[in-house]
Amino acid sequence: MKLQAVMETLIQRQQRARQELEARQAPPPPPPEPTGVRARTTMTDEDREPENARMHRTQMAALAAMRAAAAGLGHPSSPGGSEDGPPISGDEDTAREGTLSSPALHGSVLEGAGHAEGDRHLMDVGSDDDDTKSKWEEQELEELGEEEEEEEEEDDFEEEEEEEEGLGPPESASLGTAGLFTRKAPPAQAFRGDGGPRMLSGPERLGPGPAHPSHMASQMPPPDHGDWTFEEQFKQLYELDADPKRKEFLDDLFSFMQKRGTPVNRIPIMAKQVLDLFMLYVLVTEKGGLVEVINKKLWREITKGLNLPTSITSAAFTLRTQYMKYLYPYECERRGLSSPNELQAAIDSNRREGRRQSFGGSLFAYSPSGAHSMLPSPKLPVTPLGLAASTNGSSITPAPKIKKEEDSAIPITVPGRLPVSLAGHPVVAAQAAAVQAAAAQAAVAAQAAALEQLREKLESTEPPEKKMALVADEQQRLMQRAVQQSFLAMTAQLPMNIRINSQASESRQDSAVSLTSANGSNSISMSVEMNGIVYTGVLFAQPPPPTAPSAPGKGGVSSIGTNTTTGSRTGASGSTVSGGQVGLPGVSTPTMSSTSNNSLP
């Protein structure tokens, strides 16, 4: 209490001196300097200002009385009185007075003018007479080492107090030296954080891990840009396995990215574990590079190679983005497997396929070409022969080219109206040309409509049995069409004009071919006009005789021949002539039948 009363008296005198100086509007003093320099400058100032020196003599006398009282109290006086410890220099006393005056004056000493006055007192310490100065020197010799350290810490503490303007907890002001050291910890941490280019590069911002405490301890020495920094920051990545190539690769990768201007500032995490950049690079480059992996969709194999769980959603996208960010520039530089333009093209192509692809896993795939490439032209390649064919009152549904799993394309052809002209009849040729144009337009429209219907059917959720049955039906129609073309090829070698007509009652039908497979008694009823004579007959399919040699035919027809053909001339009127039977040996498909009338249009 006695010491506290002395200190309050001293503080009041300091306040009065400060008010007098403010009234005189004295210029602010220069920043604090070493004690010897301060003493010399302040003595020259006191020569010019004797009143200021006199005030400080009285203050220093009070300080001497305070030291005497403090010496009487001793060191272990009280826990809160650690400021009464061993006598130290006047610099520390004055600074501690500023600290002690903080709670009494509500922070007035810690703010602007208070700090200016404290600094002025620090500068004016050396202005005392020789006796007081020699006494201080003896005390300073006793605790020289401790004073130097505490003086630096006091300066730092006062600078921090100026910045914070007394916002710290007030209890620290009464803790003496211990309070100063506890308040010193945050500036030390800030100093460590301020320090280096390594903080600017950003790799220190790792999550808590086994390497974190040692890394924080290693920040105290000056930062180094050697490889050891990468080992410290990415210790988990380096220690995933004992492969010596791992360290070489990671060192090369990190130095390359640092020189490139895009340093690796964090460890990529996937599935709650460190993403192994080394293994990711090895797996992708073994597959041919990033572009090849994207085009061939090999991300599932990459995921398995990295021992990642297969249940990760969007694993391919995550791996691709991480590879592009951390490893793709390195791949382009070291391996040159692709270029950024190729990568962008692969990403765009993959994105378009993802929008277009259906995830139902259909058994059928459509050809990207239109209906014209899927369906043949209505014209038959018959050189001297003209043939007009149509269905027997109904149309056969056209089907597209079906591409099965073994990529064997089966062209499904559809017989439409196939009008061609006879070489020796110009009137028939003109009519056939007109019918051909109309039939071509109708065929195109029918093909488009049928193709759309078939696509809708195939895209619907039909069982695979129905789809396979549809394929079998189309194959059967294909074989029937092949038999018809084989017969026409045979008749093309004969010097005659042939008209194949159905028994339909339509008057404008030029010709027709009826192909049915409902029962086994199928036949073709036809009429042939040769030089004005009309021959009519019915063609039945006959099995090949066991001894008859079989010649290779078209579309499953082994051989085609005529058994008997009989007829009688009826004149130009075109009346019906009895006909015989024409057999088609070697036909292994359902039989064909057609009937014809005996009049020319």
Curated annotation (Swiss-Prot):
Covalent link Glycyl lysine isopeptide (Lys-Gly) (interchain with G-Cter in SUMO2), residues: 403-404, 457, 467
Region (Acidic): 128-165
Biased composition (Basic and acidic residues): 114-123
Membrane-spanning segments: none
Bias (Low complexity): 60-89, 559-579, 588-601
Residue span(s) of domain ARID: 243-335
Phosphoserine modifications at: 78, 82, 89, 102, 127, 358, 367
Keywords of this entry: Activator, Cytoplasm, DNA-binding, Isopeptide bond, Nucleus, Phosphoprotein, Transcription, Transcription regulation, Ubl conjugation
Function: Transcription factor involved in B-cell differentiation. Binds a VH promoter proximal site necessary for induced mu-heavy-chain transcription. Binds the minor groove of a restricted ATC sequence that is sufficient for nuclear matrix association. This sequence motif is present in matrix-associating regions (MARS) proximal to the promoter and flanking E mu. Activates E mu-driven transcription by binding these sites. May be involved in the control of cell cycle progression by the RB1/E2F1 pathway.
Protein name: AT-rich interactive domain-containing protein 3A
The species this protein was found in: Mus musculus (Mouse)
